[in-house]
């Protein structure tokens, strides 16, 4: 089923603190390779694999030429050009994107994926203080 095409866009960054979210020392990764991978809901072989490289600001665009309503599609990290920030962590290396017109999303053909990150092997020295500033204690329990 050909259907309308889509443009998947998103950003790749380096997480030098291994925090799992962006901090003030995170930076975008230029020249990173990402792929869109679509698989049937019930598992099985990939139905689509398309790659792109990030620009100078860490953004990528991948054109997809058909509807993938019956599949789960994800943008997945493939390769980092930055050897100091090239670790890929399972489950944190991907962002799901809906590539169908039958889901109520009104943006005509554009799908924005959540940012995805490569990690440093060892966090930067200053990361302890940076993460303390975010005050990541558990929220109080609500009665």
UniProtKB/Swiss-Prot annotation:
Main localization category: secreted
Keyword Ligase: no
Keyword Phosphoprotein included in the entry's annotation: no
Positions annotated with a glycan in the UniProt record: 24
Disulphide bridges: 14-85, 17-127, 38-73
Cellular localisation: Secreted
GO CC terms, sorted: extracellular space
Family annotation (InterPro entries): Allergen_Ole_e_I_CS, Pollen_Ole_e1_allergen
Pfam families assigned to the protein according to its UniProt record, in alphabetical order: Pollen_Ole_e_1
Keyword field: Allergen, Disulfide bond, Glycoprotein, Secreted
Protein family per UniProt: Belongs to the Ole e I family.
The protein's name: Pollen allergen Phl p 11
Higher taxonomy: Eukaryota, Viridiplantae, Streptophyta, Embryophyta, Tracheophyta
């Amino acid at each position: 089923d050909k259907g309308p095409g889509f443009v998947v866009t998103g950003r790749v960054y380096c997480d030098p603190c291994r925090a799992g979210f962006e901090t003030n020392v995170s930076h975008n990764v230029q020249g990173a390779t990402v792929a869109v991978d679509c698989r049937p809901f019930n598992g099985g072989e990939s139905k689509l694999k398309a790659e792109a490289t990030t620009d100078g600001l860490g953004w990528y665009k991948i054109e997809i030429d058909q509807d993938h309503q019956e599949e789960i599609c994800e943008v997945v990290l493939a390769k980092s050009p930055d050897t100091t920030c090239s670790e890929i962590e399972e489950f944190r290396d991907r962002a799901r994107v809906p590539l169908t017109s039958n889901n109520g999303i009104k943006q005509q053909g554009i799908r924005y994926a959540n940012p995805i990150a490569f990690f440093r092997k060892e966090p930067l020295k200053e990361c302890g203080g940076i993460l303390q500033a975010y005050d990541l204690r558990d929220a109080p329990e609500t009665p």
